[in-house]
UniProtKB/Swiss-Prot annotation:
NCBIfam families: glycerol3P_DH (TIGR03376). The gene is gpd1l. Substrate binds at K123, R272, N273. This is Glycerol-3-phosphate dehydrogenase 1-like protein. The active site is at K207 (proton acceptor). Belongs to the NAD-dependent glycerol-3-phosphate dehydrogenase family. InterPro entries: 6-PGluconate_DH-like_C_sf, 6PGD_dom2, G3P_DH_NAD-dep, G3P_DH_NAD-dep_C, G3P_DH_NAD-dep_euk, G3P_DH_NAD-dep_N, NAD(P)-bd_dom_sf. NAD(+) binds at G13, S14, G15, N16, W17, G18, A156, R272, K299, Q301. Transmembrane segments: none annotated. It is found in: Cytoplasm.
Length: 352
């Protein structure tokens, strides 16, 4: 690897999770000579009570909109211009809603040196004319850099509060994975590096669909046994989907890492996909209304991912092999009754 230190880090994104990660990286680079001591964080500029969000972050060292109550290290610098933020960066941490990745990559393509490395923390997938496209593939194609992925049972506020958790880095180049582990690991944020990067990334996207189904169950008052069935059948569909759509071999062991079963459980019991989906059942409001009310306007990944997965399954003529994924899509977008989530469990092919 031809990167010479100290390595400059740029975080592309500054929402709830991006800010929590900035807190970790800002602290870590102060103590590691391998990394430059200042970290750029690209912030989509917003006005908060008449003040620019970047100005608030750079003076008060807190993202008052997306991670209120947690101080960011003073060496994390909020930069409103994307090209300025990534200038001379050696390591790029992508942590934005997945629907913006094309636009962001187009904007910075050619502005990052060719030895730079990326890691995506983005939980989502995309669809192309050939079917499934992973976010890491899009970054790799548009920017011509090597890209690792990080996924795990990581609710952002708990990470920011330094409560113990694990996470998984997937990297086809072990050396690159270990470099990002060095940048990100703390005593309370423990990292395992695996080479099955595509499965790690798929887990991070697909578990949000299952969490929506879990939220529907909570809204219907179904109880813990039903939710356990949602989690198990959801995991079976995740594994089946990976076996069909991953280009390389899929290791079942990857599903036992933090990115797999652990992230699935935490998202189905905590996490915003579950919470908003429960409110969707109880309030009768649309997902869009609830995003505005409950998430400060941030986007929910589960419903969008279910729509992308549904279109990919349609292309392959495999919709009825994934009844849980399909039910979530149809309830969110086609006005099907929420009770369909239960009937899809009752007649699931796993039981036939």
């Amino acid at each position: 690897m031809a990167l010479a230190g100290p390595l400059k880090v740029c975080i592309v994104g500054s929402g709830n999770w991006g800010s929590a990660v900035a807190k970790i990286i800002g602290h870590n680079v102060k103590n590691l000579k391998k990394f430059a001591s200042t970290v750029n964080m690209w912030v989509f500029e917003e006005n908060i009570n008449g003040r620019k969000l970047t100005e608030i972050i750079n003076t008060e060292h807190e993202n008052v909109k997306y991670l209120p109550g947690y101080k960011l290290p003073e060496n994390v610098v909020a930069v409103p211009n994307l090209s300025d933020a990534v200038k001379d960066a050696d390591l790029l941490i992508f942590v934005i809603p997945h629907q913006f990745i094309h636009k962001i990559c187009q904007e910075i393509s050619g502005k990052v040196h060719r030895n730079a490395l990326g890691i995506t923390l983005i939980k989502g997938i995309d669809e192309g004319p050939e079917g499934l496209r992973l976010i890491s593939d899009i970054i790799r194609e548009k920017m011509d850099i090597d890209v690792s992925v990080l996924m795990g049972a990581n609710i952002a506020n708990e990470v920011a509060a330094e409560k113990f958790c694990e996470t998984t880095i997937g990297s086809k180049n072990k050396e690159h994975g270990l470099l990002f582990k060095e940048l990100l690991q703390t005593p309370n944020f423990r990292i395992t590096v695996v080479e099955d990067a595509d499965t790690v990334e798929l887990c991070g996207a697909l578990k949000n669909i299952v969490a929506v189904a879990a939220g529907f169950c909570d809204g219907l008052g179904c109880g813990d046994n039903t939710k356990a069935a949602v989690i198990r059948l959801g995991l079976m569909e995740m594994i089946a989907f990976a076996n069909v759509f991953c280009k390389g071999p899929v290791s079942i062991a990857t599903f036992l890492e933090s990115c797999g079963v652990a992230d699935l459980i935490t998202t189905c019991y905590g996490g915003r996909n579950r919470k908003v989906s429960e409110a969707f059942v109880k309030s009768g409001k649309s997902i869009e209304e609830l995003e505005k009310e409950m998430l400060n306007g941030q986007k929910l990944q589960g419903p969008q991912t279910s729509a992308e997965v549904y279109r990919i399954l349609q292309q392959k003529n495999m919709v009825n092999k994934f009844p849980l994924f399909t039910a979530v899509y149809q309830i969110c977008y086609e006005g099907k009754p929420v009770e369909d989530v239960i009937s899809c469990l009752q007649s699931h092919p796993e039981h036939m």
